[in-house]
Amino acid sequence: MAFKGEHRAILIANILIVVAISIFSSGFFPYKSLLPGLATFAETNIGTVAPKVFDRVIFMVIDALRSDFVYSKTSGFSFTQSLIRSGAALPFTAHASSPTVTMPRLKAMTTGSVPSFLDVILNIAESDTSSTLAYQDTWLAQIKAQGGQLVMYGDDTWIKLFPGVFDRCDGTTSFFVSDFTEVDHNVTRHVPRELSERDWSAFIMHFLGLDHIGHKAGPKSRHMMTKQREMDSIVALIYAAMEEQEHLQSTLFVLCGDHGMNDAGNHGGSSPGEISPALLFISPKFQTKTTPEDSPVEAFSDLQYYRTVEQVDITPTLAGLLGLPIPLNSLGVFIPEFLMMWDNDAHRIDILLRNAKQMLSAMKGTFPDLDVEAITPPHGCDKHVLRSAQDVMSSTASKYNTTRLYLGLFVAALAVLLSFFPAYGLGSKYSYAVTFLMLIIISYGGMMFASSYVEEEQQFWYWVVTAWTVYLHIKSLRPWHGSKDTRRWNQTGQKFAAEPDIARDFFPRHQNILWALIILTYFDTCMHLCLNSHSSNIWRSAAILTTIAAFFFKLVFVASDSPELLYESLLSPIQKSLEEMPLVPPARLSKAVNIPIFLMFRLQAIILDFLKMSAIEVTLTSLLSQNMTFFAFGGSNAISSVDLSNAYNGIGSYSVVLVGVLTFISNWAGPIWWASAARLLYSNPTFAERYGQRTLLTFHAATSLMSVMAACTMLRTHLFIWTVFSPKYLYTLAWTILNHMFINLPATANVSQVLNWQYAFHSVACR
């Protein structure tokens, strides 16, 4: 009876884990309150209103346009740089606050407000409409309110954000990262026609190809310079039309990136590369008003060129230049370099006062009991005062529901309590393993309260796995090699991400070793399939043909997208033939350098199989290896480390479910492999042993979740809450719900020989 009671306790604990996540998330990621309606012009007591400088705007967004892509000596934007030198373009580096993904960045540029971190999740859901801006005040809504027409071509995130707003539009799917060319051609083909049209007030373009190249091959890809020159040619086309066509004479051209990218080509975090997109305001009118800048130039700090402005400053600046009211919820400050567009000092003061009054209104909405007038100095429109108000408002942009935070934390604590006593009961039989797990949990829980440890979590798991292997070595007197090599396979985290590693530095210089390991990995997979298949020759032939097809598939992909891995190898004579083979483009998206790591896993599993470990020791070994291999594959606690390059294998069109599943499988390939391996390392556990495995897994999941929740609650006002702790919480959700609930727990069930095939096929399917 006591055993059945403990079994129910584990079941209830897993249910409580889901409940705790639901409650805590609703309090941690709320939608912030916004002022309703549209802004109108307010009196400024100046007696004169600043006239608009431009009649229409061309707003060109190049996804992931990092500042150095435009301003550095290695840039492909030669024409754009000539505009800077002539004074026709005013260059800036925009500061894109985290999260650096498209949807929240577009919200910042159109509303002038700081988006919710929940937009990171909504950004992935292609069909999501809950994050619409149709009823919020934006500079697009202000143009529409004045009778203007809007046209948009490119990333369909705009159509999601502004349903029914555009008079003409053609959206492209933003997450189909295999497409470098057609996704931009579908925008470019509309440009000449729209430039000749006279009916629009705002022409918006959003190009995705450069971002897709970054996700696939990084900022140093051989495709990057070609794409930059292509985008530069579009800038030249638009500027020529602005000079030649009469109806475009009073047009403002804005060229910007929504965010940047890191050295791996990803984004979502807060590294200098991710938060530093380029921003340029272009018009022939600027040539008579400004002093030209040099271009190209050197960055004066990490990717900071010229002057840095906040991305939300785009909104009030556009409003002032186009003669629009500043949107109600804007936290932006008018960029002072554009005050020179008004010769009358009264007009300049009018612009600043309207900005100050709008900021005052926003502050009253956030702090209704605050007497702002009493603490505002007479020079209230001064840019330093506005910047201070901007900083305060940005820091309070998201209000937590503390009741739900504490309630969710309490429910998580109940789950820990329910699983603790059954786990503690296992200590009498498996004292060393359970004690080791308890020490890990205590150390891990304390580590979650330090941002540096969260950023470098991989170091913790590398040391933990090493310590556990020492114990297994002493216990069995058999060595377990490979953990050091696995650690060096992909450098990750924040401090050591750019350090040399095996995948990016060793293999490109030793290509024959790489391909020998790849071939050996596929051979081992083939042998395992044959040995675990039916005795029928048909099954064995199918296993052999499948493995051969998978290898040549991979070979063709590498020849197409990473030919540098073939140039000096023994396979180079057939490279030209491989490049000409037609394949489905979405399938060209996997990393060959990670294939040999599966062979290392296999060798480690063979050694472990000789150790005759108990069911609990196998579970703990699998659990530790899962966490270690997640980082060994290049994962981290930053949103930018999510690898989308494998999310489209075999898919011809976007599907949020299929892409989501493939994204999880590709990023958790190592943990899934070790969850499957655990079943084979202890293939016939008793019911009591399976219960013990589920107990340890549940206890670890519950304590990890509670630790992260506690850290996020106590440190919710921390400087790094949105750049370190919130991403960590999102990763914890993936570990708890997807990996624990759908991978680890089912792996402890009493399943049949199917798992043997799952274990063997995984090396092929996940690549």
Swiss-Prot record:
Molecular function per GO: CP2 mannose-ethanolamine phosphotransferase activity
Where are the bilayer-spanning segments? 407-427, 434-454, 513-533, 538-558, 595-615, 655-675, 695-715, 733-755
Reported EC number(s) for this entry are 2.-.-.-
Tell me which CDD domains the record gives.
GPI_EPT_2 (cd16024)
Which biological pathway? Glycolipid biosynthesis; glycosylphosphatidylinositol-anchor biosynthesis
Where in the sequence does glycosylation occur per the annotation? Answer: 186, 401, 490, 627
What's an example GO BP annotation here? GPI anchor biosynthetic process
Which InterPro entries does the entry link to? Alkaline_phosphatase_core_sf, Phosphodiest/P_Trfase, PIG-G_N, PIGG/GPI7, PIGG/GPI7_C
Q: Where is the signal peptide?
A: none
Task: Enumerate the UniProt keywords alphabetically.
Answer: Endoplasmic reticulum, Glycoprotein, GPI-anchor biosynthesis, Membrane, Transferase, Transmembrane, Transmembrane helix
An annotated GO cellular component: plasma membrane
The protein's superkingdom reads: Eukaryota
Locations listed in the record:
Endoplasmic reticulum membrane
- Membrane topology classification: Multi-pass membrane protein
- Protein role: Ethanolamine phosphate transferase involved in glycosylphosphatidylinositol-anchor biosynthesis. Transfers ethanolamine phosphate to the GPI second mannose.
Which family is this sequence assigned to? Belongs to the PIGG/PIGN/PIGO family. PIGG subfamily.
Q: What is this protein called?
A: GPI ethanolamine phosphate transferase 2
The species this protein belongs to is: Aspergillus fumigatus (strain ATCC MYA-4609 / CBS 101355 / FGSC A1100 / Af293) (Neosartorya fumigata)
